[in-house]
């Protein structure tokens, strides 16, 4: 029996498969054209530990490929996929199937499209603003193209899984969405994918990438393009001066010789303080200006704008004379500042007092992914 999960249930298992070493995701395995997913007891046996109980009050989201296949069960919320099934439309969950049952989840493009549709409905009901919905979808796209995964059961305040395999690059996501058809939410998913920066290692990095790359009307600051989590090429002759053979700045502008790194709670113990000192020495030895940021720089739009101004000042010597004027106009734009406030609220909501993730990377609003 083949089981193809849909919607929120698919996203739950997708996240668990990314973060659980016992599970995996296989690409290039075509989803079945026919499914017989009506045996709930058998389905429950292959769902990962921690998945919610199945029942009529909490129906399981399942995909079927014809209207005839849809079961009339109170415990199943059936989604019909009638458009062509392309490669990587669905991913096989390895390590979960047993007794002849294969478990599939939606791939990144379909996941993003279905979330876009859910958020559109929420906006229509008045439970969410259009701006908040946009940034929530941006956050999910960044996660899908990044190396972190939010807690599937508690994405709002649960800990993230770090250093997980990338599901897809931003270009791959855009390509997959361009080929998708007949899927609700795909238009908004394409819009978001056209703006997302791939490669973020935490929600905090995703937020900073958005702040430094989005158009001004969406809350961004007009900074030059950056490299994101790419290995630094040491200047010629620098290897005898540095402590590290390689380094990977969070954000780096090679032409400007400027790097930006986020120092979260993980950097506060003595061992990591020494490591940070060595990294700062390496940057200085190579004449690279390092800007560091911490949680306080993301407490408010004003704090974020202060950080963006510092970064811009480091970049300014290699830019045109009017560069800082454009930056200041963006930073002082009240509409753009309001956008940045919403960005912060959706990607880094307030945590319980005294609680901070290992990398200061709290998850987004629970309703974003539940």
Where are these regions (language model features)?
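Surface segments flanking catalytic/ligand-binding clefts of nucleic-acid enzymes
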Residues: 162-370
């Amino acid at each position: 029996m083949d089981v193809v999960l849909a919607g929120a249930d698919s996203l739950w298992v997708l996240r668990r498969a990314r973060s659980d070493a016992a599970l995996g995701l296989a690409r290039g395995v075509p989803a079945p054209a026919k499914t017989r997913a009506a045996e709930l007891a058998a389905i429950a046996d292959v769902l990962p530990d921690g998945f919610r109980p199945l029942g009529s009050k909490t129906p399981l989201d399942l995909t079927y490929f014809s209207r005839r296949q849809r079961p009339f069960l109170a415990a199943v919320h059936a989604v019909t996929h009638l458009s062509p099934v392309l490669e990587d439309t669905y991913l096989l969950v390895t390590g979960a199937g047993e007794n002849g049952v294969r478990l599939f989840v939606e791939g990144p493009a379909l996941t993003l499209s279905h979330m876009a549709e859910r958020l559109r409905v929420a906006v229509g009901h008045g439970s969410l603003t259009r701006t908040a919905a946009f940034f929530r979808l941006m956050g999910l796209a960044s996660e899908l193209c990044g190396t972190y995964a939010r807690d599937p059961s508690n994405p709002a305040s649960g800990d993230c899984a770090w250093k997980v395999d990338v599901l897809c690059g931003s270009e791959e996501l855009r390509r997959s969405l361009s080929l998708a058809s007949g899927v609700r939410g795909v238009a908004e998913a394409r819009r978001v994918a056209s703006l997302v920066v791939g490669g973020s290692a935490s929600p905090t990095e995703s937020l900073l990438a958005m702040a430094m790359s989005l158009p001004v009307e969406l809350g961004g600051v007009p900074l030059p393009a950056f490299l994101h989590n790419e290995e630094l090429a040491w200047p010629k002759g620098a290897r005898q001066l540095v402590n590290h053979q390689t380094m990977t700045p969070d954000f780096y502008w090679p032409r400007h010789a400027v790097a930006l790194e986020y120092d979260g709670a993980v950097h506060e113990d003595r061992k990591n303080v020494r490591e940070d000192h060595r990294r700062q020495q390496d940057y200085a030895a190579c004449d690279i200006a390092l800007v560091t940021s911490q949680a306080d720089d993301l407490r408010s739009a004003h704090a974020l704008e202060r950080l963006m101004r510092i970064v811009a000042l480091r970049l300014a010597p290699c830019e045109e004379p009017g560069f800082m004027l454009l930056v200041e106009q963006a930073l002082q734009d009240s509409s753009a500042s309001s956008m940045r406030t919403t960005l912060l609220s959706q990607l880094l909501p307030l945590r319980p007092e005294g609680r901070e993730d290992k990398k200061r990377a709290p998850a987004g609003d629970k309703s974003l992914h539940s």
